[in-house]
Regions:
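A preference for well-ordered globular domain cores
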Residues: 1-187
Length: 187
């Protein structure tokens, strides 16, 4: 998954006030200098501000970070909401497409998670009588079908999938907990 996935530069025009128009450039990953300001007024005349987060400094003195431009000085709530929603999206994307079982990519959409849980629960409740069960892994272009014939094998798959989800969630919570809004305060 590339840095900043699934975000690209998006431009949106909004009307506010007395028919005034503002243009917002939505979240993008930027390459720049290490030590970059997390909040910066880039154009005082037009009241343009940039918010930066997820700064990843590199050995060569440069840095990569996410950035969003505002047509006004963003409030604490706007900054917090922006960064938290980005971390939530990153966590969701990692859960959705980051798990593999025995080398096969497993798409963990909410629907698939529900189907895996239902199949596992039913197999446990019936002592494996509902087996075999077949799941499609991989992609639509390169599907890999896996048939679970033994309860232990299905249990192994399901507990690894749940463990992966829990690990990714914990990593996302840790990043969100480390976010410090005080670093964005400018007097």
């Amino acid at each position: 998954m590339p840095d900043g996935f699934p975000f690209e530069t998006t431009i949106k025009t909004e009307t506010f006030g007395k028919g005034r128009t503002k243009i917002r450039v939505y979240m993008r990953r930027v390459e720049g200098s290490s030590g970059v300001s997390l909040m910066e007024c880039t154009n005082p005349v037009k009241d343009k501000w940039r918010i930066r987060w997820d700064v990843q400094e590199k050995e060569n003195g440069s840095a990569s970070y996410m950035e969003e431009e505002f047509g006004h000085k963003p409030t604490d709530e706007e900054i917090h909401t922006l960064v938290m929603s980005w971390y939530n999206s990153q966590t969701d994307a990692a859960i959705l497409s980051g798990f593999a079982y025995n080398g096969a990519h497993v798409w963990l959409s909410v629907e698939n998670q529900y189907n895996y849980k239902a199949a596992y629960d039913l197999a446990v409740q019936t002592g494996g009588e509902t087996l075999p069960v077949t799941f499609k892994f991989g992609s639509d272009e390169q599907p890999e079908y896996h048939t679970f014939t033994q309860l232990e094998e299905l249990k192994d798959f399901y507990t690894k999938a749940v463990g992966f989800i829990q690990t990714v969630l914990a990593e996302g919570w840790e990043k969100k907990d480390k976010f410090n809004l005080e670093l964005y305060r400018i007097e």
